[in-house]
Amino acid sequence: MRTGIIAQKVGMTSVFNDKGERISLTLVKVDDCQVVGHKTLAKHGYNALVIGVKDQKISKVTKPMKQVFANAKIAPKTKLKEFRISEDNFIDIASILEVDHFRVGQFVDITATTIGKGFAGSMKRHNFRGLEASHGVSISHRSHGSTGQRQDPGKVFKGKKMAGHMGCNKVTIQNLKIFAVDTNRKLIMIQGSIPGHKNSYLLVKDAIKKAAITIA
């Protein structure tokens, strides 16, 4: 099991293949992705790499983290993430991970945060059909209806689908195929859509349900 990388969503585009079919692509940029530390089975109970991305001002880093970066002899990073790995996939601290960490035709799993939609009603948030448009319904056409029973149990159960904050959820999309890798511009072109807004950070890992490397 290899480490993943922290990337940044650039946007979307599309291309046409030889059959004239349109393929939607999401562009992901991998820049300044560096190994910050190791987690070992003997010391921490599991094997992992700590990956950091984007240099940070030293004045914005806490004292404990300053020592971590000083020990690694690298510049402070804005975002850190651990990736579980197998024992034979450790990479030296301060090593830089580039886009060639992945290959064309490979399948990946991507974890990202969905775009926030703010406070949303039940029809938008949960796809409820709403109440009747006429015939006895007043004001509450887009209402979610009843939320519970009577004195027993006398409460609304947790997890009840109601109006509330929508979006900003951590989501993993599995088995997305890498269409192309541009080493000059540090871009990975991935077929399909990926959650999150432009410039948001996401995690790219080898697909857990597919072969590690599949050449197109």
Curated annotation (Swiss-Prot):
One annotated Gene Ontology cellular component of this protein: ribonucleoprotein complex
Segments for region (Disordered): 136-155
Post-translational modifications reported in the UniProt record: Methylated by PrmB.
Keyword Membrane listed: no
PTM-bearing positions, type N5-methylglutamine: 151
UniProtKB keywords: Methylation, Ribonucleoprotein, Ribosomal protein, RNA-binding, rRNA-binding
Signal peptide positions (record): none
Superkingdom of this protein's organism: Bacteria
Residue spans crossing the bilayer: none
GO biological process: translation
GO MF annotations in UniProt: rRNA binding; structural constituent of ribosome
Keyword Thylakoid: no
Pfam families: Ribosomal_L3
Function: One of the primary rRNA binding proteins, it binds directly near the 3'-end of the 23S rRNA, where it nucleates assembly of the 50S subunit.
Recorded family membership: Belongs to the universal ribosomal protein uL3 family.
PANTHER family: 50S RIBOSOMAL PROTEIN L3, LARGE RIBOSOMAL SUBUNIT PROTEIN UL3C
Assembly mode: Part of the 50S ribosomal subunit. Forms a cluster with proteins L14 and L19.
Name used for this protein in its record: Large ribosomal subunit protein uL3
